[in-house]
UniProtKB/Swiss-Prot annotation:
Gene label: nuoD
Organism from which the protein derives: Hydrogenovibrio crunogenus (strain DSM 25203 / XCL-2) (Thiomicrospira crunogena)
Reaction catalyzed: a quinone + NADH + 5 H(+)(in) = a quinol + NAD(+) + 4 H(+)(out)
Protein's job: NDH-1 shuttles electrons from NADH, via FMN and iron-sulfur (Fe-S) centers, to quinones in the respiratory chain. The immediate electron acceptor for the enzyme in this species is believed to be ubiquinone. Couples the redox reaction to proton translocation (for every two electrons transferred, four hydrogen ions are translocated across the cytoplasmic membrane), and thus conserves the redox energy in a proton gradient.
Topological type in the membrane: Peripheral membrane protein
Name of the protein in its database record: NADH-quinone oxidoreductase subunit D
Family matches, as Gene3D superfamilies: Cytochrome-c3 Hydrogenase, chain B
PROSITE patterns: COMPLEX1_49K
Subunit structure: NDH-1 is composed of 14 different subunits. Subunits NuoB, C, D, E, F, and G constitute the peripheral sector of the complex.
Membership in a protein family: Belongs to the complex I 49 kDa subunit family.
Length: 417
């Protein structure tokens, strides 16, 4: 009688559902998964080591490139670490701007996740819908920083500049003309805050569209209900944070439990799941988009009523205005020193974490008193989630691995660093 053996299969890194560069070695018994072994490191760029060779203020751009769909949330943890070690006070207006852009980033991330997750499972429409909304939010990034993705907008002491009074408009082209052009520019007549406010009015309707397509869809439920179940106790043991932990029923959110910036002044809820399966995590992230929309609305209202400075006036840490640099010798010296050698941070260490769209994103920073970090450690939420893949996938079918990778919301920039 011939021997029955499990066979080994490579999943990725070329697979379209591998979300970048995931290589999984799957051990299969027929079509049932016995073991799944993630092989990481294909996107390793040595970010932590590179940061040790750059002045503190020159590594912000590296943070954007960690989780490259949640750019400003990464920057936030890094600049908060520097501010904590230097004891810098951030103006209240800058704090509201940061919180507003953190939530815009959360929606951007969840739209990308929803579109890609649905596409992996076979629902193509949601992918196209999600990218329609992402376009508007990318325009907000571009309005404040000039870049659609890698913004480098957060700076130690505040943000790069205040919110613009005008929004860029679409111009006539072979793609946009006449009535369509007027429709596209309708919400771009006022300031950036007017544009964001108009978006927050439209967005709940868009989320309803996604839910109409997926939430009660029989095929979607068959592919996600009771797949990749993680109990609350096990989720804590595995180091889950963010929607992965809340999907298992634990209401842990740093914005509520360890408030930073102005989150303690804002009204929002923490959505939690009940069973800890892929479907629950889907519901949690969709509910989070609605909550983020609520927070953005509150920030817009406050920012419209309260003008003020958006960055600290300590020119040892923040650059002087261009007008000052052109007319004042001392300001020019500050500017030159800041952009050539940066500033020295007192000896010590700090750990700062933010409620990133994927979970707890933390920066552990050690300074030896020089102008560069002695050591920088990034605590990436996706790393802990990916480590649980073997446990979550065991006993499921090979097609369910795609649903489980999707529900974990893995981005390899932060996992491989």
């Amino acid at each position: 009688m011939s021997e029955i053996r499990n066979y080994t299969l490579n999943f990725g890194p070329q697979h379209p559902s591998a979300h970048g560069v995931l290589r999984l070695v799957l051990e299969l018994d027929g079509e049932t998964i016995v073991r799944s072994d993630p092989h990481i490191g294909l996107l390793h760029r040595g970010t932590e080591k590179l940061a040790e060779y750059k002045p503190f203020n020159q590594s912000i751009g590296y943070m954007d490139r960690l989780d490259y769909v949640s750019m400003m949330a990464n920057e936030h943890a890094y600049v908060m670490g520097i501010e904590k070690m230097l004891g810098i006070e951030v103006p209240e207006r800058a704090q509201y701007i940061r919180v507003m852009f953190d939530e815009i980033t959360r929606i951007l991330n969840h739209l990308m996740w929803l579109g890609a997750h649905a596409l992996d499972i076979g629902a193509m429409t949601v992918f196209l819908y999600a990218f329609r909304e992402r376009e508007d939010l990318m325009d907000c990034y571009e309005a404040v920083s000039g870049a659609r993705m890698h913004a480098t907008y957060y700076r130690p002491g505040g943000v790069y500049r205040d919110l613009p009074d005008t929004m860029a408009k679409y111009e006539e082209s072979k793609w946009h003309s006449g009535k369509k052009l007027d429709q596209l520019n309708e919400t771009r007549e006022g300031s950036l805050l007017d544009f964001i406010e108009a978006f927050t009015e439209r967005f709940p309707g868009y989320v309803d569209e996604y839910e109409t397509l997926l939430t009660d869809n029989r095929i979607w439920k068959q592919r996600t209900v009771d797949i990749g179940i993680v109990s609350p106790e096990r989720a804590l043991q595995l180091g889950f944070t963010g929607p992965m932990l809340r999907g298992s029923g634990i209401a842990w959110d740093l914005r509520k439990k360890q408030p930073y910036e102005v989150y303690d002044k804002l009204d929002f809820d923490i959505p939690v799941g009940a069973t800890g399966d892929c479907y629950d995590r889907y519901l949690v992230r969709v509910a989070e988009m609605r909550e983020s929309n609520k927070i953005i609305k509150q920030c817009v209202k406050w920012l419209k009523e309260n003008p003020g400075p958006v960055i600290s006036d300590d020119h040892k840490v923040t650059p002087p205005s261009r007008e000052d640099a052109k007319s004042n010798m001392e300001a020019l010296i500050h500017h030159f020193k800041l952009f050539t050698e940066g500033y020295s941070v007192p000896e010590g260490e700090s750990y700062t974490a933010v409620e990133h769209p994927k979970g707890e994103f933390g920066i552990y920073m050690v300074s030896d008193g020089a102008n560069k970090p002695y050591r920088l450690k990034v605590r990436a939420p996706g790393f802990a989630h990916l480590a649980s893949l073997d446990e979550m996938a065991k006993g499921h079918m090979i097609a369910d691995v795609v649903a489980i990778i999707g529900t974990q919301d893995i981005v390899f920039g932060e996992v491989d660093r």
